[in-house]
């Protein structure tokens, strides 16, 4: 029997499971879905509520001590909500992606999109940084982590920012095709 696939989801409150009951955070549901597809897995929830890309830089080496086989990277939403300079966010994400590449860890990189209320200029600077980095590092890529969930009240908690369980299900469903391709391309074994 193949050893379980060690998958780390590295990110912020969208990963940590802010406002969700235990066992219903994104990594938990992702682990269940992977098991349904035949991938035995050990899921590591490396989500920290409120984390920024700068925070991610400070803890990536610590996180890599767990020796993940694959990393799902979901960071930058808090940078955006705080109006931090997109160039700084991009540089921080580049540092994290470089560390993952140095360790030979394949990445499913999940992008964020700035909402219109932050202004067209900010969005024009922030939104392209994710596809640019995905190209630079040749990672598997999800252009918008909250695709089909953002701004849909029925799929979010009352704060309008964090997905509820139904929203998590949509996110996992959207991510699975890209993650399955990544795992297959790495020759990861089911079982």
Mark where each language-model region is:
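Alpha-helical cap/lid subdomain in secreted, periplasmic
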Residues: 29-39, 55-191
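Acidic-and-aromatic substrate-binding clefts and catalytic sites of carbohydrate-active enzymes
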Residues: 50-54
């Amino acid at each position: 029997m193949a050893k379980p696939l060690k998958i780390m989801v590295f990110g912020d409150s969208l990963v940590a499971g802010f406002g969700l009951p235990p066992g219903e955070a994104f990594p938990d549901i992702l682990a269940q879905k992977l098991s349904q597809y035949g991938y035995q897995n050990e899921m590591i929830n490396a989500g920290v509520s409120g984390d920024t890309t700068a925070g991610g830089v400070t803890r990536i080496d610590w996180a890599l001590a767990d020796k993940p086989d694959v990393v799902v990277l979901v960071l930058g939403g808090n940078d955006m909500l705080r109006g931090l300079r997109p160039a700084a966010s991009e540089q921080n994400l580049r540092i994290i992606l470089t560390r993952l590449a140095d360790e030979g860890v394949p990445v499913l990189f999940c992008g964020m999109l700035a909402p219109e209320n932050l202004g067209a200029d900010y969005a024009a600077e922030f939104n392209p940084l994710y596809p640019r980095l995905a190209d630079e590092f040749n990672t598997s890529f999800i252009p918008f982590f909250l695709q089909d969930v953002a701004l849909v009240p029925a799929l979010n908690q009352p704060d309008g920012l964090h997905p509820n369980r139904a929203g998590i299900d949509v996110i996992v469903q959207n991510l699975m095709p890209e993650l399955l391709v990544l795992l297959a391309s790495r020759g990861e074994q089911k079982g």
